[in-house]
From Swiss-Prot:
Pathway: Pyrimidine metabolism; UMP biosynthesis via de novo pathway; UMP from orotate: step 2/2
Molecular function per GO: orotidine-5'-phosphate decarboxylase activity
GO BP annotations, alphabetical order: 'de novo' pyrimidine nucleobase biosynthetic process; 'de novo' UMP biosynthetic process
Originating organism: Frankia casuarinae (strain DSM 45818 / CECT 9043 / HFP020203 / CcI3)
Keywords assigned: Decarboxylase, Lyase, Pyrimidine biosynthesis
Source lineage: Bacteria, Bacillati, Actinomycetota, Actinomycetes, Frankiales
Name of the molecule in the record: Orotidine 5'-phosphate decarboxylase
Broadest EC class assigned to this enzyme: lyase
Region (Disordered): 1-21
Residues holding substrate: 32, 54, 99-108, 154, 215, 224, 244-245
InterPro entries given in the database record: Aldolase_TIM, OMPdecase, OMPdecase_AS, OMPdecase_bac, OMPdeCOase_dom, RibuloseP-bd_barrel
UniProt cross-references to SMART domains, sorted A to Z: OMPdecase
Length: 274
């Protein structure tokens, strides 16, 4: 449905589709670090290049909100208003993506969203499987945050989905959950690069699509089941590609980030010619 689906309201319904600042790649680096010092080192290396820094469960559970404060103090993460400037960068520093995948009853998720809003994230993830009421509660509790609704984890293949009662190809579950999320008011979705083209065609151009499970050609897939290259994800309709280990596990994360950014830039130019 190229015209997109109507939502039930909320700030996310009016949020503009994500566009990286000038000079920054549509790339989020997953700071899945074992400690704050490692996260700060990785962030400093990639901050001049990328649009977003993603903090997930491992780092946030270990360090708590203090890691956000530390990244901002180091000048490698934008403030709540996006005003900080990264050393060596071209404009404001990367924005904050809290990938906490909230999934609970609506009141509890709403309370969680209110608790983390003061940290000034651009994105916070919740699970679509929590249902429409939970998604609406998250959006209403944090009107200044883009609630990014996770459809189906990129680690789940056909067999894994069948084992939890979701028979059929992953694309079917992704489509159902994406439509549910948008009808509940979401305007930012998380899906694998294998399904991003389908979701874009179904929901149109007014939805921000974030794609984890992205691996440069030749990289190990690890525990990811539904992957594609950064370039394929972008051409398929992704607005923000998430890359972790291929960057943070590289000998020089900054060089790795710049190489992926260059590939994304070339893919974007090629897509514009289609």
């Amino acid at each position: 449905m190229s015209a997109g689906r109507r939502s039930s309201g909320g700030r996310s319904a009016a949020a503009p589709r994500f566009t990286p600042p000038r000079g920054r790649a549509p790339l989020a680096v997953a700071l899945d670090a074992p400690d704050a010092a490692t996260a700060l080192r990785w962030a400093a290396a990639v901050a001049p290049t990328v649009a977003v820094l993603k903090i997930g469960l491992e780092l946030f559970y270990r360090e708590g909100p203090a890691i956000v404060t530390a990244l901002r103090a180091a000048g490698v993460l934008a403030g709540a208003g996006g005003a900080a400037v990264a050393a060596g960068g071209t404009g404001s520093a990367p924005e904050l993506f809290l990938d906490l995948k909230l999934h609970d009853i609506p009141a509890t998720v709403a309370g969680g969203m209110r608790s983390i809003t003061p940290l000034g994230p651009r994105f916070v993830t919740v699970h679509a499987a929590g249902g429409a009421a939970m998604i609406r509660a998250a959006i209403e509790a944090a009107p200044d945050v883009e609630v990014a609704v996770v459809t189906v984890l990129t680690s789940l293949d056909v067999a894994a989905l069948s084992a939890i009662g979701l028979a059929g190809p992953p694309s079917d579950a992704v489509r159902r959950l994406a439509v549910l999320a948008v009808e509940a008011g979401a305007r930012t979705l998380v899906c694998s690069p294998r399904e991003v083209r389908m979701v874009r065609m179904e929901l149109g151009s007014n939805v921000t699509l974030i794609t984890p499970g992205v691996r440069p050609a030749g990289s190990e897939t690890g525990d990811q089941a539904r992957t594609a290259t950064p370039e394929a994800a972008l051409v398929g309709g992704s607005d923000l590609v998430v890359v972790g280990r291929p960057i943070t596990g590289a000998p020089d994360p900054g060089v790795a980030a710049r190489a992926i950014a260059a590939g994304l830039s070339a893919a974007g130019r090629a897509a514009d010619l289609l």
